[in-house]
């Protein structure tokens, strides 16, 4: 009997010890600092502002810099992280801040094309002023004659990261790609061979400096010039599928705005005459409706990041402006004075 009582006492002690252990390790609202009782805040980044309308964040984006500002406008969190590390950690960036309401800001970059393509926070200390989280193309002259590393932006106001209990809370910050590749192809319809040196290409704009909210900051104009220019033979845009001589120029430009008026200009270097001078935005938007999606002009410009233009010239390098091709769509021009 004494042996049985001893076993029961031992069992009761073990049971009590287990109950106390569970109580100590449980997450109580009154013991926020206990080990194992955590409130974890995380941010997931999304890049579906593209023409495929799907999230491809982990593919083109390589590094992310996240800033978090509290309701007083103070910078309380700042971290730069490789996207490969974010993906390895489950696809999230962890925030080491208290649960509250924050404004989240992101500058992100893709695969490096040109080292130090941008200068960030050029207008002053952003510790107490999110408006100073600007981004400017790194340049010493008006002309940009090199490729630019892809630039992305994210900005979410009044993000609710409050938590009433322990656990994990995740919010999403969508990104917009700012940089665009513009490829200009000039084909000769007469059979005359074209040389890359026959033409001078440029795009004049004033979008080299962007504010914290991705809007343009008043700045000197900027001229984008080709980082690649070459000649060769291409398939003619006709039913005969013949090969014709062509010159190709590739330029990378910063964010395009529906309210601005950049100009794409091409000159004949043999005589200095202008081949054409067209409004880039107006021409880019000519094919927006062909994608069968409801988009504002600005949304289309933000989703589309690859613009391919094909122009035709005669044997004197004069522009044959009856029609052009934009992103493989044939466009019959009614007004070449746009």
What are these regions (language model features)?
Residues 33-51, 174-187:
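A short, Gly/Thr-enriched small/hydrophobic beta-strand-prone motif that recurs across taxa
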Residues 23-26:
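C-terminal motif of bacterial Sec signal peptides marking the signal peptidase cleavage site
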Residues 64-118, 195-291:
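Tryptophan-paired
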Residues 2-16:
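Bacterial N-terminal signal peptides that target proteins for export
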Residues 253-338:
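Hydrophilic extracytoplasmic domains
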